[in-house]
UniProtKB/Swiss-Prot annotation:
The lineage of its organism: Eukaryota, Metazoa, Chordata, Craniata, Vertebrata. Signal peptide: none annotated. A zinc finger (PHD-type) spans 56-105, 271-321. The modification Phosphoserine is found at S131, S134, S555. GO terms for cellular component: nucleus; Sin3-type complex; transcription repressor complex. It comes from Mus musculus. InterPro entries: FHA_dom, PHF12, PHF12_MRG-bd, PHF12_MRG-bd_sf, SMAD_FHA_dom_sf, Zinc_finger_PHD-type_CS, Znf_FYVE_PHD, Znf_PHD. Zn(2+) 3 binds at C274, C277, H297, C300. This is PHD finger protein 12. Zn(2+) 1 binds at C59, S61, C62, H79, C82.
Length: 1003
């Protein structure tokens, strides 16, 4: 029964191993971040063999990655080309590969085994291979002398056998990069440790001191050379490369904490702002300084940056910028300066250092920046002597020898200027005018007081050569004044001194006495200065002007009606105006010289009408006493005759020229000369041809051209032969004004016939060598083709002493000297002992567009008061020759002296520029110009720059260089505007005003 009442045990299916608290805590726990799990995770590497598990990922030699060949016995890895010896893919072994170090050690172990068998130490050698400490045990136990010698000898053999057959690479050991190799060597090369413990036994067996080092180096793997750490620059200088994180190099945007920068320079919260503008990175990316916590925008920097810096960047708040920017600092100095300023600087130290500096008694010199030195040039001794001993000054450029030098009409660019801007003041003009009038009056008084020369001899005229001659403005004035000394009546109103000479030339001889020259006023000429200004009487010049190119003297004609003088049935023949002369065109040269082309008269007339009309050499009938000799009456008669001449020649170019325009001619300035000089020869008026007589044998005196009247035999202008010739022509005139040829004198007929022969045969007269200075009479009218082929003159070389003629420079060069082949032969201009055969040369430089003079003479040439001569200074000797050269020169010099002593003495023939023969004639030179050089004797051998009006002196011969383009500059403008009187007056220079000289461009 009790068995029935026994209860059964209840079994519950519950897990009693643990409670539910862990699960409850896991459900109630906060969420976990994944960063810890990611960081804790490590990539599982593949299981590799133990031998290759420690191989390096980069080459042990060059420390670069790539395809590497791994050693099977050590962790070393190499490129195929970095192995020792280098390998190729075909040379790779099929089985295991050992590096050079492992190969050497394997051979070493094998040799040790063989050596142990030889010496009967097989057991010990076997133990040595099994136990790494066998060598130490061997040394600890006592050994005999024979055993020690055997061991030492074995070590030497091992080192010799360990040398491979091929040499190692050029690289040596490298301390910081061979850490793995050193560890492996310590593990594997334990058997080498006893070598250091027994140096006494090894050293006596070594033959060379570095044999042990070489043996150790031969066992190492090849490595590239690198400086040790103590020699390498470890200072982080600005601009050096810095290590980047792997995320930056791979470009992965890794999530970082909020206080760090991302790789784009954007700064999340907490906000960091720019040090300059205090704005965040939302404006622009910020740049973090690598040496301080400051940040900057790229645009806030000075100067602003265009890109983010790649290396280390230092902000401008550091003092190192001032010190490190110096160019003379080396790398070691930069590192020292950078390390010095790395720590914080004490303000107290700065103050004390400043006080010590300012209280120093002898402060150090400041570093002064060396300024860039200009290129220095050594001043020649010739220029120094020129400033030390200046020559005497020449006359002013505006007035020379009492004659005004004008520069022509201003250019178009200067026409807008008023007359007062480029002319003298009114007071200066009045003073200049009074001086010119007083000068002319004194010249007339001097010339009128001279004695009249002897009359013309008719017999000498027949034998002498008949050459066409004409008188210029300056020479006619003085020559006609001395022709007739008859006084003028006191009641004649004379307008200017030129009227005296004009009336005297006309043959007037009233009984009354003339007034004094001081009482003569020039008021009428001043009033009519625009039409007929008074010119200066410079006197005749005995020269033959040699023309070089076509120069046509053309000017406007007056529009006044022809007037006849009261009491005379015919107009005054031969009275012409200067502006009516046509400019002659010269034929080719006739002397064999390139610059001696022809003959031309060049006058100084820069403004329209010329001076009072005393222009004719042909005498006219005497005037009645009641006729007033004024400039206007004579001007009208000259205009009448000029119109008559132009009607014979044909259409003239002078009709088309507006009134007031100056003639396009070359002006040559000649100084005043004595009254006894001969007449200036020219061919200016020889272009006019006298017509053939009519069928009835009568010729009208009005049809006689200027050329026929002026082309007379070369006799003095002041003789009475011309007056007699004119009177004989008037005696045979009939009532109608025609001349009966049958009634003419025989001499007059011969003269007219000879003139006609010159007109008909110009080529024969021109080709004759004696007529170089002459000019054909009709070449201008009969040979227009020749005129077009002629060359116009570039410049004129004019003498100042009255001898010789002016030479035109029509080509680029002009040679001056006493030689026969010179363009300007100085013997024609006077005698001087200090001139050379080839004295100087004038040439035109295309680069500088200027004329230049080059001196060849040892006497020198003075240009514009500056001496240009040869350099006679002692030249510095070159470097002394070597001993061998000096000995050879001494032998040659000694041999030359011996030959001179053996030869008979003869007079040494010397070449000299001075003429050999009779004694030289004296000249006006006191000494050669080269004597004016300073004591050093260094003359200036450069070229002289020539301008318009440059003064040239060759010895005692004086010349003036004139540029034709400068003297003939024409105003550019419309012809209709030039006809306006007001504008023409502004553009033209008045003759009584002193113009200001201006430089002009060279042609």
């Amino acid at each position: 029964m009790w068995e029935k009442m026994e209860t059964k045990t209840i079994v519950y299916d519950l897990d009693t191993s643990g409670g539910l608290m862990e699960q409850i805590q896991a459900l109630l726990a906060p969420p976990k971040t994944d960063e810890a799990e990611k960081r804790s995770r490590k990539p599982e590497k593949e299981s590799r063999r133990s031998g290759r598990a420690t191989n390096h990922d980069s080459c042990d030699s060059c420390k670069e990655g790539g395809d590497l060949l791994c050693c099977d016995h050590c962790p070393a890895a190499f490129h195929l080309q970095c192995c020792n010896p280098p390998l190729s893919e075909e040379m790779l072994p099929p089985g295991e590969w050992m590096c050079h170090r492992c190969t050497v050690r394997r051979k070493k172990r094998e040799q040790k085994k063989e050596l142990g068998h030889v010496n009967g130490l097989v057991d010990k050698s076997s133990k040595r291979t099994t136990s790494p400490s066998s060598d130490t045990d061997l040394l600890d136990r006592p050994a005999s002398k024979t055993e020690l010698k055997a061991i030492a000898h074995a070590r030497i053999l091992e080192r010799r056998a360990s040398r491979p057959g091929t040499p190692t690479s050029n690289a040596s050991t490298e301390t910081p990069t061979s850490e793995h190799n050193d560890v492996d060597e310590d593990i594997v090369d334990v058997d080498e440790e006893p070598v250091a413990a027994e140096p006494d036994y090894v050293q006596p067996q070594l033959r060379r001191p570095f044999e042990l080092l070489i043996a150790a180096a031969m066992e190492r793997n090849p490595t590239q050379f690198q400086l040790p750490n103590e020699l390498t620059c470890t200072t982080a200088l600005p601009g050096s490369s810095k290590r980047r994180r792997k995320e930056e190099t791979t470009g992965k945007n890794v999530k970082r904490t909020q206080h760090e920068l991302d790789h784009n320079g954007l700064v999340p919260l907490p906000v960091k702002v720019c040090f300059t503008c205090n704005r965040s990175c939302r404006v622009a990316p910020l740049i973090q300084c690598d040496y301080c916590p400051l940040l900057f925008h790229m645009d806030c920097l000075e100067p602003p940056l265009t890109a983010m810096p790649l290396g280390r960047w230092m902000c401008p708040n550091h003092i190192e910028h001032v010190v490190l920017n110096q160019k003379n600092l080396t790398l070691s100095n930069r590192c020292q300066v950078f390390d010095r300023f790395q720590d914080t600087i004490s303000q107290h130290v700065v103050k004390v250092d400043f006080l010590n500096r300012i209280h120093k008694k002898h402060p150090p010199n400041r570093r002064v920046l060396q300024s860039v030195k200009r290129r220095s040039l050594k001043v020649p001794d010739a220029i120094k002597s020129q400033y030390q001993f200046p020559p005497p000054l020449i006359a002013p450029a505006a007035i020379r020898d009492g004659e005004l030098i004008c520069s022509g009409v201003p250019e178009e660019s200067q026409t807008h200027l008023l007359n007062s801007e480029h002319l003298a003041t009114q007071a200066e003009q009045q003073e200049w005018l009074c001086s010119v009038v007083a000068l002319q009056c004194s010249i007339l008084k001097h010339l009128s007081a001279k004695q009249m020369p002897s009359p013309w001899d008719s017999e000498q005229t027949e034998k002498a050569d008949i050459k066409p001659v004409i008188v210029t403005d300056s020479s006619i004035t003085t020559s006609l004044q001395t022709a007739d000394k008859a006084p003028l009546p006191s009641h004649y109103p004379l307008s200017c001194p030129s009227a005296v000479s004009t009336q005297n030339s006309l043959g007037c001889s009233p009984p009354h006495q003339p007034p004094t020259l001081e009482d003569i006023s020039c008021s009428s000429c001043v009033e009519k200065s625009k039409k007929a200004p008074c010119g200066t009487a410079n006197g005749p010049v005995n020269t033959e002007i040699k023309a070089n190119g076509p120069h046509l003297y053309s000017s406007p004609t007056d529009s006044t009606d022809p007037r006849r003088l009261p009491g005379a049935n015919t107009p005054l023949p031969g009275l012409t105006h200067r502006q009516g002369w046509p400019r002659p065109l010269t034929p080719p040269s006739a002397g064999g010289l390139q610059n001696h082309v022809g003959i031309i008269v060049k006058t100084e007339n820069a403004t329209g009408p010329s001076s009072c009309p005393q222009r004719s050499l042909v005498p006219v009938p005497s005037l009645p006493p009641s006729i007033p000799s004024s400039c206007a009456s004579i001007e009208n008669t000259s205009t009448l005759h000029r119109k008559t001449v132009q009607s014979q020649i044909g259409p003239s170019s002078t009709e088309s020229r507006p009134l007031g325009s100056p003639p396009n001619a070359t002006r040559v300035l000649t100084p005043p000369q004595a009254a006894g000089d001969s007449i200036l020869a020219t061919g200016a008026n020889q272009r006019f041809c006298s017509p053939a007589p009519s069928s009835d044998g009568k010729v009208s005196p009005g049809t006689l051209s200027i050329g026929s009247a002026l082309t007379v035999p070369s006799f003095p202008a002041n003789s009475t032969a011309m007056v007699d010739l004119t009177n004989s022509l008037r005696a045979f005139m009939d009532v109608n004004g025609e001349i009966e040829i049958n009634m003419l004198d025989e001499k007059l007929i011969k003269f007219l016939a000879l003139q006609r022969v010159h007109q008909l045969f110009p080529s024969r007269v021109q080709a004759s060598p004696g007529n170089v200075g002459t000019h054909p009479l009709a070449s201008g009218g009969h040979h227009p083709e020749v005129q077009r082929k002629e060359v116009q003159a570039r410049a004129v070389f004019c003498p100042l002493l009255g001898l010789g003629g002016a030479v035109n420079m029509c080509y680029r060069t002009l040679y001056i000297g006493t030689g026969a082949d010179m363009d300007v032969c100085l013997t024609n201009y006077g005698h001087c002992n200090y001139v050379s055969g080839k004295h100087a040369c004038i040439f035109y430089d295309e680069n500088t567009k200027h004329y230049e003079l080059l001196n060849y003479s040892e006497h020198g040439t003075t240009v514009d008061n500056v001496l240009y001569s040869c350099d006679f200074s002692e030249k510095t000797p070159p470097t002394p020759p070597s001993s061998i050269v000096a000995k050879v020169q001494s032998v040659i010099r000694r041999r030359r002296h011996q030959k001179q002593d053996e030869e008979p003495s003869e007079e040494a023939a010397m070449m000299s520029s001075q003429a050999q023969g009779p004694q030289r004639r004296p000249c006006n030179c006191k000494a050669s110009s080269s004597s004016l050089i300073g004591g050093s004797g260094a003359g200036w051998e450069g070229t002289a720059l020539l301008h318009h009006g440059s003064y040239i002196k060759l010895g005692c011969l004086q010349f003036v260089f004139s540029i034709t383009e400068f003297a003939t500059k024409q105003p550019k403008g419309d012809a209709s505007l030039l006809q306006d009187g007001v504008l023409a007056e502004k553009l033209s220079l008045k003759p009584h005003q002193g113009p200001v000289l201006r430089s002009n461009s060279v042609p």
